[in-house]
Swiss-Prot record:
GO biological process: photosynthetic electron transport in photosystem II
Similarity comment text for this entry: Belongs to the PsbB/PsbC family. PsbB subfamily.
Gene Ontology MF terms: chlorophyll binding; electron transporter, transferring electrons within the cyclic electron transport pathway of photosynthesis activity
Lineage: Eukaryota, Viridiplantae, Streptophyta, Embryophyta, Tracheophyta
Tagged with keyword Chloroplast: yes
PANTHER family: PHOTOSYSTEM II CP43 REACTION CENTER PROTEIN, PHOTOSYSTEM II CP47 REACTION CENTER PROTEIN
Main location: plastid
Keywords from the UniProt entry: Chlorophyll, Chloroplast, Chromophore, Membrane, Photosynthesis, Photosystem II, Plastid, Thylakoid, Transmembrane, Transmembrane helix
Subunit structure: PSII is composed of 1 copy each of membrane proteins PsbA, PsbB, PsbC, PsbD, PsbE, PsbF, PsbH, PsbI, PsbJ, PsbK, PsbL, PsbM, PsbT, PsbX, PsbY, PsbZ, Psb30/Ycf12, at least 3 peripheral proteins of the oxygen-evolving complex and a large number of cofactors. It forms dimeric complexes.
InterPro entries xref list: PS_antenna-like, PS_II_antenna-like_sf, PSII_PsbB
Protein name as annotated: Photosystem II CP47 reaction center protein
Transmembrane portions of the chain: 21-36, 101-115, 140-156, 203-218, 237-252, 457-472
GO cellular component, one term: photosystem II
Cofactor annotation comment: Binds multiple chlorophylls. PSII binds additional chlorophylls, carotenoids and specific lipids.
């Protein structure tokens, strides 16, 4: 046929059988990738430390999506929360991966069958004998079926009526587990961080889809609308489908980057805004203050801070710290977290407590500045020692650790104090193993960052695809160079004055 690569889809333009075939093959490829990727991730995933080496630190991409839908067990005998199990059941991580691969194989065979047997009676218009599709009817069928699936997911899977529920956690990502969720029918259901909204919105959207599907199955579009929107043209279907996909991609890019109940931090890692706003730092200080109010010592109060909460308050877990072109997991960047060293408290020789100013998200380097409780600079690590007034040596800064592995240990040696001041810029101080994976010390993004970048990029690309194909189908006659009134203009007797549409003759 000699088609250039960008014109190859014309082979399925007037061939419904093979149009169906290539879509089934596409589904086979998507399902096959999902299953294969899941098996690869399971082969490299280390479930031994869900607190300091969770799935998002290891760069897992499909495991978090399975987990948020209720899969927590592996045929390898482990549970995602760190426990061991004896009977994982069919729907384990491996079971879901295998189901996708089997489904992919069946779709592959179905695609071949439909490619070979393309000329089916169902695709022929009985009036003309030519291949044709009743697109408004097909639209109604798809709307109805997707509505049923949407309603079923919200009413059965999410609520636990017939299914496991979904991953639900507290606001600080500490107590997450799979559990049934009751639909939230009040105004709280519109809060993106309320899991009940997931159930209620799927039930509502599914109901709407079912009703809309039945409407489109029982009511034919008006002729003027049918012609105006080119409802008989398959490229109209392509254009509107692309619109649905790019809109969904923009939405999920937003819910992933800014966070929501659908993207728990235990599965995808924290958001950059939680670092920017000191979200975890505030909660840690609140807990310490509450402990002190109960007559606990500083050491006791800090020792009760969960290691998981402290780890969230570390800049290396901020998805905006990784460059777009730095490949690999977070563990390949700053290393595998081994343990929390504790919270460093700095004091000058007068005994005044000093706080290290934290590094903002978009800085790679940042001056080490220590301020007092009023925000006044009291110490720093100077760039030029000759002009320094507030150096650690001059001010006599010491550091003492509370909680963690170095609980109760203090240092007054300036070199050690400066080392921990630099590390305190990055949040809570952790021991990181960079040898095991030959980590290079350069921060990487989490799957939250990759997902957002990928979906925002493809959404933009698909937006232009929607405009392109929409314009092609709406202005098909213009692009083809054929004026639809051309025959009327040259037809003898169509107009009182030849070629003048304002003098059109009335039919007798």
């Amino acid at each position: 046929m000699g088609l250039p690569w960008y014109r190859v889809h014309t082979v399925v333009l007037n061939d419904p059988g093979r149009l169906l075939s290539v879509h089934i093959m596409h589904t086979a490829l998507v399902a096959g990738w999902a299953g294969s990727m899941a098996l690869y991730e399971l082969a490299v995933f280390d479930p031994s430390d869900p607190v300091l080496d969770p799935m998002w630190r290891q760069g897992m991409f499909v495991i978090p999506f399975m987990t948020r839908l209720g899969i927590t067990n592996s045929w390898g005998g482990w549970n995602i929360t760190g426990g061991t199990i004896t009977n994982p059941g069919l729907w384990s991580y491996e079971g879901v991966a295998g189901a996708h691969i089997v489904f992919s194989g069946l779709c592959f065979l179905a695609a071949i069958w439909h490619w070979v047997y393309w000329d089916l009676e169902i695709f022929c218009d009985e009036r003309t004998g030519k291949p044709s599709l009743d697109l408004p009817k097909i639209f109604g069928i798809h709307l109805f079926l997707s509505g049923v699936a949407c309603f079923g997911f919200g009413a059965f899977h999410v609520t636990g009526l017939y299914g496991p529920g979904i991953w639900v956690s507290d606001p600080y990502g500490l107590t997450g587990k799979v559990q049934p969720v009751n639909p939230a029918w009040g105004v709280e259901g519109f809060d993106p961080f309320v899991p009940g909204g997931i159930a209620s919105h799927h039930i509502a959207a599914g109901t709407l889809g079912i009703l809309a599907g039945l409407f489109h199955l029982s009511v034919r579009p008006p002729q003027r609308l049918y012609k105006g929107l080119r409802m008989g043209n398959i490229e109209t279907v392509l254009s509107s489908s692309i619109a649905a996909v790019f809109f969904a991609a923009f939405v999920v890019a937003g819910t992933m980057w800014y966070g929501s109940a659908t993207t728990p931090i235990e599965l995808f890692g924290p958001t950059r805004y939680q670092w920017d706003q000191g979200y975890f730092q505030q909660e840690i200080y609140r807990r310490v203050s509450a402990g002190l109010a109960e007559n606990q010592s500083l050491s006791e109060a800090w020792s009760k801070i969960p290691e998981k909460l402290a780890f969230y308050d570390y800049i290396g877990n901020n998805p905006a710290k990784g460059g777009l072109f730095r490949a690999g997991s977070m563990d390949n960047g700053d290393g595998i977290a081994v343990g929390w060293l504790g919270h460093p408290v700095f004091r000058n020789k007068e005994g005044r407590e000093l706080f290290v100013r934290r590094m903002p998200t978009f800085f790679e380097t940042f001056p080490v500045v220590l301020v007092d409780g009023d925000g006044i600079v009291r110490a720093d690590v100077p760039f030029r020692r000759a002009e320094s007034k507030y150096s650690v040596e001059q001010v006599g800064v010491t550091v003492e650790f509370y909680g963690g592995e170095l609980n109760g240990v203090s240092y007054s040696d300036p070199a050690t104090v400066k080392k921990y001041a630099r590390r305190a810029q990055l949040g809570e101080v952790f021991e990181l193993d960079r040898a095991t994976l030959k980590s290079d010390g350069v921060f990487r993004s989490s799957p939250r960052g990759w997902f957002t970048f990928g979906h925002a990029s493809f959404a933009l690309l698909f937006f232009f695809g929607h405009i392109w194909h929409g314009a092609r189908t709406l202005f098909r006659d213009v692009f083809a160079g054929i004026d639809p009134d051309l025959d009327a203009q040259v037809e003898f007797g169509a107009f009182q004055k030849l070629g003048d549409p304002t003098t059109k003759r009335q039919a007798v």
